[in-house]
């Protein structure tokens, strides 16, 4: 998932994406703990996707505050 794709989404869509990614992260952590996870790199990819979504949300919040001031 690219940051440019995320910037085109609304805040509501980004929040939904964040919830979905958090659920995926939890699932991957449980699979890792029970040694059922084959692709260990997925944990890092999901973590970076969460960071991207949170960064775009912060950008949008900052832009909204700047336009109101």
Curated annotation (Swiss-Prot):
Signal peptide: none
Keywords (A to Z) from UniProt: Ribonucleoprotein, Ribosomal protein
Pfam families cross-referenced by the UniProt entry: Ribosomal_L29
Molecular functions per Gene Ontology: structural constituent of ribosome
Example of a GO biological process term: translation
An example Gene Ontology CC term for this record: cytosolic large ribosomal subunit
Keyword Ribosomal protein (UniProt): yes
Family affiliation: Belongs to the universal ribosomal protein uL29 family.
NCBIfam families reported in the protein's UniProt record: L29
Protein name: Large ribosomal subunit protein uL29
Organism encoding this protein: Methylobacillus flagellatus (strain ATCC 51484 / DSM 6875 / VKM B-1610 / KT)
Lineage: Bacteria, Pseudomonadati, Pseudomonadota, Betaproteobacteria, Nitrosomonadales
Gene: rpmC
């Amino acid at each position: 998932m690219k940051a440019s794709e995320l910037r085109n989404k609304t805040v509501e869509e980004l929040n939904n994406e964040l919830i979905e990614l958090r659920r995926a992260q939890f699932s991957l952590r449980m699979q890792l703990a029970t040694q059922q996870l084959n692709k260990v790199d997925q944990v890092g990819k999901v973590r970076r996707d969460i960071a991207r979504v949170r960064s775009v949300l912060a950008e949008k919040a900052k832009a909204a505050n700047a336009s109101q001031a």
